[in-house]
């Protein structure tokens, strides 16, 4: 009776990659092995050469321990007989595989002839000179002898990083060692002296080192006696010359927060504000008046000083004022004649509401109309600098001795409100 069933160690041996002595052939021939069973002859297969490709050493030892056993079965008991496996070289395995098993075989893996390969262990991987990689080398204690002519590399390993080169100055003719220099000069590979030179030769081209860009530029990109290139200098100057945010921007008046008030700030320096004398402005109205000789019509139009609507409103106001004065004068002619005998300078005018006092010059009959004209002209000059139109005053107007027109108390309170 023949035993057709394959023992479990046969499946493990078939999965191993076996290498021969030549690279062209990868022999996978399996030689028959006799099993001694009482009353039966069973054959099994074993590999002529073994190779390790990615499995752990414990698996190989387990496979060899299984393959080393032969079974003898009798009707009464089963006897285990061991056979020694030997490779083509006939050498035995190290003692690690035979721990705890006195009868386990010993086998040494060899791949041709040659000296043992030196490897570099990085983490869990070991890298060899001919790109042969052995994983889990900690669990495998086999002295591997590898022939570079007989085995082709399976996987390319990472090359060993070379030692860092000592930095030197890249200027031609310098070649100064920068190992003891500053980090800045080591990084950009230039010595401290050549970083300030106006002209150096790098790779056969005349250049200059920019201390802000940290790069070499052509000589045309530098200004004379400047260590930074023209582009960096322009950016630096633009950052330094930023306009003050509290000042005028794009020719528009801005708010002055320094004095906690709204002020019209104009960029032109020729504008000057002066305080006029008290001869041209009423005593109760104080305001800054721009010099007429230094402000053109364009400037007046910009602030709305010569608006046609403003002119029309002022003309209507003055015409109403003249009519009011003349009507009051006509109604009180008799009283003027009586009072003129008592005083040449003071006249009382009767009105339906209440009497008003007029202060005239020495000749009231001849100077009344010119005083009214002067009052209108002075009102023109005073109210012309204010954009909002003042409301019309219906009541009579008091005229002082100095010949300057003045509105009633309502107009003065309005002027104080605008101030």
From Swiss-Prot:
GO terms for molecular function: DNA-binding transcription factor activity; transcription cis-regulatory region binding; zinc ion binding. GO terms for cellular component: nucleus. A zinc finger (SBP-type) spans 166-243. Residues 77-96, 230-249 are annotated as: Disordered. Gene3D superfamilies: Transcription factor, SBP-box domain. It holds the Pfam family SBP. Binds 2 Zn(2+) ions per subunit. It is found in: Nucleus. A motif (Bipartite nuclear localization signal) lies at residues 226-242. The keyword Transcription applies. Keywords: DNA-binding, Metal-binding, Nucleus, Transcription, Transcription regulation, Zinc, Zinc-finger. Its cofactor is Zn(2+). Its main location: nucleus. Induction: Negatively regulated by microRNAs miR156 and miR157. Up-regulated by Turnip mosaic virus P1/HC-Pro protein, that acts as an antagonist of miR156. Zn(2+) 1 binds at residues 169, 174, 191, 194. Disulfide bonds: none annotated. Zn(2+) 2 binds at residues 210, 213, 217, 229. SUPFAM superfamilies: SBT domain. The SBP-type zinc finger is required for the binding to DNA. This is Squamosa promoter-binding-like protein 2. The lineage of its organism: Eukaryota, Viridiplantae, Streptophyta, Embryophyta, Tracheophyta.
